Design a protein with these regions (language model features):
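Segments of small-molecule ligand-sensing domains
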Residues: 332-344, 354-410
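Extracellular/periplasmic Venus flytrap/periplasmic-binding protein
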Residues: 121, 166-167, 174-278, 315-324, ...
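Periplasmic-binding protein-like
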Residues: 126-139, 159-161, 203-206, 254-264, ...
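Beta-alpha junction/loop-to-helix N-cap segments that form part of ligand/metal-binding clefts
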Residues: 51-53, 65, 78-85, 97-167, ...
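Extracytoplasmic "Venus flytrap"
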Residues: 50-86, 110-116, 139-140, 205-212, ...
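Short, solvent-exposed amphipathic alpha-helices that sit
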Residues: 79-96, 118, 158, 186-189, ...
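N-terminal export leaders
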Residues: 14, 24-28
């Protein structure tokens, strides 16, 4: 399978950060805004922990098969590709140093184009044909929702899906392990920021599926805490760029801000539609939009000022040890590697999974892997801490807000 990445170009001064939330489990030391570009460009390499090995690679031992279904083609492909690249940077490093208990890691990634029926067929193949030990790095709420019955039936762990949906958190799902913060936490942060800025007329654009419904519910809840309701609500079909009607509908309510719950193809199209109508509303996206993909889809300064909530550290801040490690291994994988929030999330998720696999022992089963996750003490990946336990599989509540500029970050 071809490995693909995105190009970012950096220009100092375009990033703003506000309202950092450490959460109850995740802590991150963020330096002042004006130092971030300098650190990204000039901070010397920080000595990093090497990928751990619990023994030399033994070629006669069976591989540890990790199964992933994600969009690797189609309108939302960059999300799946970037997550996979970040994860592979760590998995390949582990394999170079002997694997896990002498066993090589093999990530099998199947393309679902962000369409639930394909996710279902891919998952059956991963479980029945490929004999995956664990499902890892699935992308999207509607796609993950479609395979939850298989997860429950086969009792296979689903680790670090790229979704903050409530349905993976409430009620508790014993086979689902969430790394990222919930969409509720993200929307709470952005609504609090908008209200503090005096923007009370808040509209919502949502994807017409499980993801959009979850984000819409979260926005209602966040606004309700301030005694507010959405001034207008419009929907858009998944993967669609036909957003002119939705823009006109919201524009009639004269919103001062719009919370957008969609992937980057629809979000970018809607941003162009709304700007074309002369709106000055502040646009806010949840992290699933894919920051780099959104910037790529809005060239020439069209993305300037758009807000995006983030659930991982800033990928260019090498003062955070795990970010420096991520950059080093990404460069080792590919000369001139591009960094980004989604690939960093994949990298962090891969590190979390291998820590549990090490703890599960030389002959891991699905049950042993679950026990290993739940039995781990707080895991500090190097400035990004994760903690779960029996009855609570939410590892991080970290949320940060970023605002895009006319130039893209880079590399």
């Amino acid at each position: 399978m071809a490995r693909m990445s995105q190009r970012f170009c950096f220009r100092p001064g375009w990033l703003q950060k506000i309202g950092v939330t450490s959460g109850r489990r995740t802590t991150l030391a963020l330096l002042p805004l004006m130092l971030a570009p300098l650190m990204a460009a000039s901070t010397p390499d920080v000595p990093q922990p090497r990928p751990r090995s619990t023994g030399a690679m033994q070629t006669d031992l069976p591989e540890l098969v990790l199964g992933q279904s994600a969009p690797l083609s189609g309108p939302s492909a960059q999300l799946g590709r970037d997550y996979r690249e970040g994860a592979l940077a760590w998995f390949n490093a582990v394999n170079r140093r002997g694997g896990i208990h002498g066993r090589r890691l093999r990530l099998i990634s199947l393309d679902d184009r962000y369409e639930p029926p394909l996710t279902q067929s891919n998952t059956r193949q991963l479980i029945e044909t490929e004999r995956a030990l664990v499902l890892f790095g699935y992308v999207g709420t509607p796609t993950v929702k479609a395979i939850l019955p298989m997860v429950d039936q086969t009792q296979i762990p689903l680790v670090a899906p790229l979704t903050g949906a409530r349905l993976l958190r409430q009620p508790f799902r014993p086979m689902v392990f969430n790394l990222r913060a919930s969409y509720q936490a993200e929307v709470d942060q952005m609504v609090n920021s908008l209200v503090r800025a005096g923007r009370h007329r808040i509209a919502v654009l949502h994807q017409e599926d499980a993801f959009g419904e979850d984000g819409l519910r979260a926005t209602h809840s966040a606004l309700g805490r301030h005694g507010l309701k959405p001034v207008a609500i419009a929907g858009v079909k998944r993967n669609s760029t036909a957003t002119d009607a939705a823009a006109r509908q919201l524009m009639r309510a004269d919103p001062s801000a719009v919370v957008i719950i969609s992937a980057y193809p629809s979000s970018a199209a809607f941003s162009r539609s709304l700007q074309g109508l002369g709106s000055t509303a502040q646009l806010m996206n949840v992290s699933f939009v894919g920051t780099g993909a959104l910037q790529d889809a809005l060239p020439g300064g069209q993305a300037s000022g758009i807000g995006v909530s983030q659930v991982v550290p800033f990928p260019w801040n090498r003062q955070v040890p795990v970010v420096a490690e991520y950059q080093r291994l990404m460069r080792q994988e590919q000369r001139g590697a591009r960094y980004g929030f989604t690939s960093l999330e994949g990298f962090l998720a891969a590190r979390w999974l291998t820590a549990a696999l090490e703890k599960a022992g030389p002959n891991p089963t699905r049950q042993r892997l679950v026990a290993a996750f739940e039995g781990m003490p707080e895991l500090d990946l190097g400035g990004f801490k994760l903690k779960i336990g029996p009855g609570d599989h939410q590892a991080s509540d970290f949320v940060d807000l970023t605002f895009l500029g006319a130039q893209r970050w880079g590399p």
